[in-house]
Amino acid sequence: MRKLILKAAVLLSASAAFFLPEVPAQDAPKRDYPIQPVPFTAVHVNDAFWAPRMEINRRVSIPTAFEQCERTGRIENFVRAAMVLEHKDLQDKHAPGYPFDDTDPYKVIEGASYALSVHPDPVLDAYLDALIAKIAAAQEPDGYLYTTRTIDPEHPHEWSGTERWVNEEVLSHELYNLGHLYEAAVAHYQATGKRTLLDVALKSADLLVATFGPGRKTIYPGHQIVEMGLVKLYRVTGRTPYLALAQFMLDSRHGGRSYNQADLPVIEQTEGEGHAVRATYMYSGMADVAAMTGDKNYSKAIDAIWENVVGKKMYVTGGIGAVGAIEGFGPDYDLPNMSAYNETCASVGSAFWNQRLFLLHGDAKYVDILERTLYNGLISGVSLDGEKYFYPNPLESNGQHQRSPWFGVACCPGNITRFLPSLPGYVYAQQGDSLYVNLFLSNKATVTLEGGRKVAIEQETKYPWSGDIRLTVSPETAGRFTLKVRIPGWARGQAMPGDLYEFAETRASEPVSLQVDKHTVPLNLDHGYATVTREWKPGETVDLHLPMPVRRVTANAKVAADRGRVALQRGPIVFCAEWVDSPDQHVRNVVLPASRTLKADFAPSLLNGVEVIRGEADAYRYERNGKLAHTTEAFTAIPYYAWANRGAGQMEVWLPTTESGAHPTPFPTLASQSKVTVSGQTEAANGTRSPHMLADQEEPGSSADASSQYNWWPKKGSTEWAQYDFGGERRISSVDVYWFVERQGGVRLPAGWRVLYLDGAEWKPVEAGGPYGLALDQYNHVAFQPVKTQAVRLEITLQKDKSAGVSEWKVQ
């Protein structure tokens, strides 16, 4: 993309028009959120934590995401669709990889537009002009925009359906694509003043208004977000049919599946269920409609859902969506760590949702969750250099998790690129004559309060490493107004709202203190905010001190995976132990007794500068004779968001406090010391698949235990293999295979399998002494005539419409 935008700059005018012309509006919005965020363009971040990340996002993540969209044909799909509309001969009419591939350029355009708003860049501006022209050319005359159908109306992607919209409630993603288009269009218009993409969006939205609604087609989006996009178009234009359609689509949800929150009417839903990204986008859309219409049924429903999610289904990192097979919520308190999915997109969606709930209710608890997610489960989704991404964000790893530059389903990179540049818009908010301070980071901002009073505010802090924050408040003229400063729950002894997590230490910590012009004032807490109402003069200071001791966190006893374990937290940051910092490069064998003292110190040269927690822990291992041994060794924990930036290996957030909870390092076996390869070995679609999991000596709990396994998804009906190379000739006589299956996915038992050994350069079947078993929840043992060989293979025949997987494969 770096070369592409330079080429575009030559072809197009490099001058950027940073103005905001009026869009003709039918009606101005009459209602809105009672609290309004201060626009991100009014907040200039200059701290050492977020400013570098935002700059890396601008300089690295956005350009490389555009490069990936070019390389993988996502942008070419628009060119191909335009050729069809122009009646040109298109030889290649193959369907895109997925029908939602159109959204990836849209999301990166949105992020690039936010970046342009605060950092004018004529080269990037010109590149967007060229890209938007391609998108506009792919739009059909009536406004329909969906490249896979336009490229080949007779044979679109298999998920798309034979006609427009007929498969929308299941898999086509037609409306999902448009939701991201609308959000990108509004962002681009507001950043540049140009209507090029906005006109495409409005033409599309007018088609939706003409197609769906009372007396027309009834439909609910299979993957929610168009509701949020329609509300954004309503905000810009004031055209009430867009808002009405967003509400109609929400109200049409019932009689479907819980997977996409369509089993019950939205106002009757009370629990987080199904696909987590779909869910948070829907809850955000419900909040928007509630704010714009005043319908309290929506807010009542999402309030109940929030209590369920935060109280029973959220990880200590703020991540949501425990179940990988559905990328979504599991049962209450079912929060496994190694198989935790916690999709990066779900964390972004959670941030959207919690921000909207704060704007509705003005309670700091929503910002507490936003902050927890932001500093832990969200930014863990991108590497420190801005070039690689996590799709899932587990809380435990045996080395199978690695960030990837891109994915087949590439929703997460685009979501990161659009969220980070908008972060300054989450710092402050305003209601009447009250100014809310929600997030702590060094910045300068100007806020307009009720009556047009302008207040300049400056923050100076080393947060999140220090809890000392100085605010300098400078109204244009002296006057009376209210400053509301969030006091985080973690600083008030509350690990998280509700009883899902709590601090292990019951002793009182150092109190929070607040000073105005160096005079201590009472906190006067109101819904989690220290409230100071007074006559303010320019240049007055507010000093907030939030103590940051190292805290041990415990989980509700109903969370089976975390019993007898603690997580470590300091300030808003959750920590983890990572293999690199362990003397033996293992951390899952570590026990951290409650009696051990822990201290924090700043390591400026580590991971771009981080606070680390140090102490001593006990490390357990099995010796050759099978006896359990342990040693006391130095212990180091790093911020969770920074893990997997130094290579693949073990990681653990929840640390056992006694020997019974440890995973002692096993004594090596023939399989564990072998080189492991598999057929069709490529990077997993979500960056979590590694062949070495077949021989990691991790005993599965059941065949459905997804924590440590390898599968061949999305291969179906083919013959696949896994291979151990011994590095020399070995005598073997049996294998044990533990099959992995998904309860709700496409990985099932194979149709059959056999064992082959390498004889010279030829693979030969062994002479098995019994059947090749396909039993679940146990090892399938096959003994055979002993052979001497340098390598052995499992050859697996997949069922016609299914894939297969293996949790563990032993060789004797």
PLM region descriptions:
Residues A8-F18:
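Bacterial N-terminal signal peptides
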Residues I151-S172, L198, K203-I219:
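Asp-box/WD-like beta-propeller blade repeats and closely related beta-sheet repeat scaffolds
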Residues A28-P122, A126, P156-A191, Q224-P241, ...:
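Aromatic (Trp/Tyr) and acidic
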Residues Y220, T665-F667, S702-Q812:
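Aromatic, loop-rich ligand-recognition surfaces of beta-strand-rich domains
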Residues L124-T147, N297-V310:
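Carboxylate/His-rich catalytic cores and anion/metal-binding grooves
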Residues I302, D368-N376, G381-T472, R492-V516, ...:
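C-terminal beta-rich recognition modules with glycine/proline-rich loops and embedded aromatic residues
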Residues P664-S702:
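Predominantly extracellular/luminal regions of secreted and cell-surface proteins
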